[in-house]
Every structure is written in structure tokens, then in C-alpha cells.
UniProtKB/Swiss-Prot annotation:
Tissue: Brain.
Molecular function via GO: GTP binding; GTPase activity; metal ion binding; structural constituent of cytoskeleton
Chain span(s) of sequence motif MREI motif: 1-4
Posttranslational mods: Some glutamate residues at the C-terminus are polyglycylated, resulting in polyglycine chains on the gamma-carboxyl group. Glycylation is mainly limited to tubulin incorporated into axonemes (cilia and flagella) whereas glutamylation is prevalent in neuronal cells, centrioles, axonemes, and the mitotic spindle. Both modifications can coexist on the same protein on adjacent residues, and lowering polyglycylation levels increases polyglutamylation, and reciprocally. The precise function of polyglycylation is still unclear. Some glutamate residues at the C-terminus are polyglutamylated, resulting in polyglutamate chains on the gamma-carboxyl group. Polyglutamylation plays a key role in microtubule severing by spastin (SPAST). SPAST preferentially recognizes and acts on microtubules decorated with short polyglutamate tails: severing activity by SPAST increases as the number of glutamates per tubulin rises from one to eight, but decreases beyond this glutamylation threshold.
Organism field: Pseudopleuronectes americanus (Winter flounder)
Protein name: Tubulin beta chain
Cofactor(s) demanded: Mg(2+)
């Protein structure tokens, strides 16, 4: 079996991670004690990817939970599925990172990282053939960003040929916890560009907009945001957890999605969007799902795909539906909006279908786009970073932990390079096509 080892770091990472395990345990028919109560052999066929079968037929998540303070871990442990995790896999410090990337990466986090790696090794040894790692974390705080990226680089050293996949929650000015988020996020992206194979950018701003506009929630809570994140995570991992042909492992997904190694930041989307507790009962048609899925308002990253072009796209449809109809609809989208797909990668849209829909829905679709418009997110981050860094605001918190200003400058220029690379491929055309692209701002339908 091709196993995936899951890591969650920091408060945000542990909260969305715990929610992810609730959702997929439910989809695989596993109750909070780790016992299988399902009704479909498909649920068990690839259960080993995410779960270890322990004695007495119990299924235990291949998950390592990390934090620099005990608080969030305690709430995960006392949460709905808290008892399903292996107790030894909770690794936590007492000091906290105080939203300081340097503490997570160089001081506090560096002290804890070896005990985390011990647990990771132990989990990796129980794997038959480990395909890679996935990390849930946020980029705005101290632990998820600083220690999360430290873990990534340490794991990279030890398992250089395994795929590294992250679900990274990107800070946004509208939903801000901390004034130093732009520093933490820029320093993290500096690491992610070099050390991960696939990063799903999940953006609080986009999640808030979805809650306000589409779900009509007047005061969205983190619970509502996490509900959206877990639906998306469940969707993008469907191909890895259920039998299927397309993108059935992390490496195949990377091969299909990443045309240039640095450009591996994906924009996820989900349809139909439903709020917690009120899953819609009206059946959606395949055309509606396809239309919604490509709609800018459904993207989980606050970038408008109409401002850029898709390098590659993967779509996952779930539920009982006609493959023929799915293929027709996907072709239809590409033909109608051909200017939004780069013409120098033919067949750059791939589609997978899985029979088992998520709970409460007849069918759903998940979207993974590698779009040049993601540069908007990095630009936004970079502008905020520069505004503070020019004045050296708050820098003493970082230099006090032994960091050098040079590292800030490098991170800043690496991020700006990333933006220019996206721009370069957005403008590139196939030679014979010339520059005859007219960019309309019409709705992508």
C-alpha cells in the first residue's frame, strides 16, 4: 500500500487537521473509537493510505500532532474524534511561539523538532511503502509557520525522494490575528517554494467571502471556515483514499499539476457550497457543478482566476454520474473560455470521478487549479511585508531570537521572483499564436 503520513502543526493546523480526520473517518465508516461500521467495500479498499490497522481491528490515523503549547492539543483530545489518535503521537512544548516565526523555526521549535522526528520515523517504519507527507498549518502564526517549515526541511533531508504536500492557510488583512502575519507568511513562503512539491493555498479572506456572500452567514466563526476547509481537503484527497485511475497518488498528482518546480501553489475550489448543518437536498446537475466549480466566487484563495491563466487543472467529481456528461461539460468549459487556459500545455485539464459522495450530498466536485492569478495573493503579502520591513517595524522580536535581517531580504526577493515567474508564464504564448489574446472580464462559465 502507498501510505501518506499526516502532520499538523500549530493551533490552526491542529484545528483543520482534526476536522479533516472527522470528515474522512466518517467517509470511511470509522467511528471515534477507530472501529469500522461501514457498508461499502470501497471504504476499506485503500484505508491503509491514511490509517494503520492496530490490534483488535482498530484503525488509527497515521497522524502526528505538533504544537509548542498544550492548549489546542487538549481541545483536539477532548474533541469528537480525539480518542482515535495514537496518544504517543501528540508532541507538544509548553512555551508557545508567541506568533513569532523565529521562535518556531530557530529556538523553541528547534528544541522540539527532534522528538517530532522520532515519532515521524516510527510512523514511517510502520509503512509498507510511504509515498509522502502532508502537513496542515497556517502561515501567519509562529508554530505552524516557523516550526511547520522547519519540520518540512528536516523531513526533506531524511526522506528526499518522498512527496511533500501542504495545506497552508494564508493570512489575510481582513481576518487578522496578529500584526506580524506578513513577516511570518513571507518567511514561510520562502521555505515552501524550495521544499514542498504541492501546496494548497487556503485563504481566510476567500473563506470569509464565501461564508458572507454564498452561504449568507452574517457572523462566520472559525468553525464555519474550517467546515469549508475540511470539505475541500476531503475532496482533494478523494483520489488518494478511494480506488480510481487518475491522480491516484501524490506523485502522479504532482506530475500532472506542476509544470515548473517552483510554481506548485494551487487554488482549491469546491461545489456545491453548503453551510454547516444545512446541506442542500436539491440535486445538482453535472453542468451546474462544473459551472460553480470554475466560478471565481468558489475559490478558496482570494485571487480572481479571470486575472490570470490556468497552467493546469484537476477536477474531482464525486457521486453517481455519467462519465460522458462530465467529460462533455469539462470540454465545454475549456472551449468557451479558452483564453483562460495556456495554449502551450495541451490537455491541461484532468478529471477524476469517485462513486462515493461526501456525507449529505448526492454529488459534489472539487477543483484544483494551478493558476498564474495566485500571484495576487503573493503580491498582497509582499506589499504588507515591505511596508513594515522598510521601517524595520517589529524586527527586534526576530533578531532577538538570533535571526539576521539578511534572511528577511532574501525571503522578500524570493517572493518577488515567484510573482515575476507567474507573470512570465501568464504572458507566454505558443510561438505561432502570437500575442492575439484578448482578456475579457467575462464570468467563467
Amino acid at each position: 500500500m502507498r501510505e501518506i503520513l499526516h502532520l499538523q502543526a500549530g493551533q490552526c493546523g491542529n484545528q483543520i487537521g482534526a476536522k479533516f480526520w472527522e470528515v474522512i473517518s466518517d467517509e470511511h465508516g470509522i467511528d471515534p473509537s477507530g472501529t469500522y461500521h461501514g457498508d461499502n467495500e470501497l471504504q476499506l479498499e485503500r484505508i491503509n493510505v491514511y490509517y494503520n490497522e492496530a490490534t483488535g481491528g482498530k484503525y488509527v490515523p497515521r497522524a502526528v500532532l505538533v504544537d509548542l503549547e498544550p492548549g489546542t492539543m487538549d481541545s483536539v483530545r477532548s474533541g469528537a474524534f480525539g480518542q482515535i489518535f495514537r496518544p504517543d503521537n501528540f508532541v507538544f512544548g509548553q512555551s508557545g511561539a508567541g506568533n513569532n516565526w523565529a521562535k518556531g523555526h530557530y529556538t523553541e521549535g528547534a528544541e522540539l523538532v527532534d522528538s517530532v522526528l522520532d515519532v515521524v520515523r516510527k510512523e514511517a517504519e510502520s509503512c509498507d511503502c510511504l509515498q509522502g507527507f502532508q502537513l496542515t498549518h497556517s502561515l501567519g502564526g509562529g508554530t505552524g509557520s516557523g516550526m511547520g517549515t522547519l519540520l518540512i526541511s528536516k523531513i526533506r533531508e531524511e526522506y528526499p525522494d518522498r512527496i511533500m504536500n501542504t495545506f497552508s492557510v494564508v493570512p489575510s488583512p481582513k481576518v487578522s490575528d496578529t500584526v506580524v502575519e506578513p513577516y511570518n507568511a513571507t518567511l514561510s513562503v520562502h521555505q515552501l517554494v524550495e521544499n514542498t512539491d504541492e501546496t494548497y493555498c487556503i485563504d481566510n479572506e476567500a473563506l470569509y467571502d464565501i461564508c458572507f456572500r454564498t452561504l449568507k452567514l452574517t457572523t462566520p466563526t472559525y468553525g464555519d471556515l474550517n467546515h469549508l476547509v475540511s470539505a475541500t481537503m476531503s475532496g482533494v484527497t478523494t483520489c488518494l483514499r478511494f480506488p480510481g485511475q487518475l491522480n491516484a497518488d501524490l506523485r502522479k498528482l504532482a506530475v500532472n499539476m506542476v509544470p515548473f518546480p517552483r510554481l506548485h501553489f494551487f487554488m482549491p475550489g469546491f461545489a456545491p457550497l453548503t453551510s454547516r448543518g444545512s446541506q442542500q437536498y436539491r440535486a445538482l446537475t453535472v453542468p451546474e457543478l462544473t459551472q460553480q466549480m470554475f466560478d471565481a466566487k468558489n475559490m478558496m484563495a482570494a485571487c480572481d482566476p479571470r486575472h490570470g491563466r490556468y497552467l493546469t487543472v484537476a477536477a474531482i467529481f464525486r457521486g453517481r454520474m455519467s462519465m460522458k456528461e462530465v467529460d462533455e461539460q469539462m470540454l465545454n468549459v475549456q472551449n468557451k473560455n479558452s483564453s483562460y487556459f495556456v495554449e502551450w500545455i495541451p490537455n491541461n485539464v484532468k478529471t477524476a470521478v469517485c462513486d462515493i459522495p461526501p456525507r449529505g450530498l448526492k454529488m459534489s466536485s472539487t477543483f484544483i487549479g494551478n493558476s498564474t492569478a495566485i500571484q495576487e495573493l503573493f503580491k498582497r503579502m509582499s506589499e504588507q511585508f515591505t511596508a513594515m520591513f522598510r521601517r524595520k517595524a517589529f524586527l527586534h522580536w526576530y533578531t532577538g531570537e538570533g535571526m539576521d535581517e539578511m534572511e528577511f531580504t532574501e525571503a522578500e526577493s524570493n517572493m518577488n521572483d515567484l510573482v515575476s515567474e507567474y507573470q512570465q508564464y501568464q504572458d507566454a504564448t505558443a510561438e505561432e499564436e502570437g500575442e492575439g489574446e484578448e482578456e475579457g472580464d467575462e464570468e467563467v462559465a
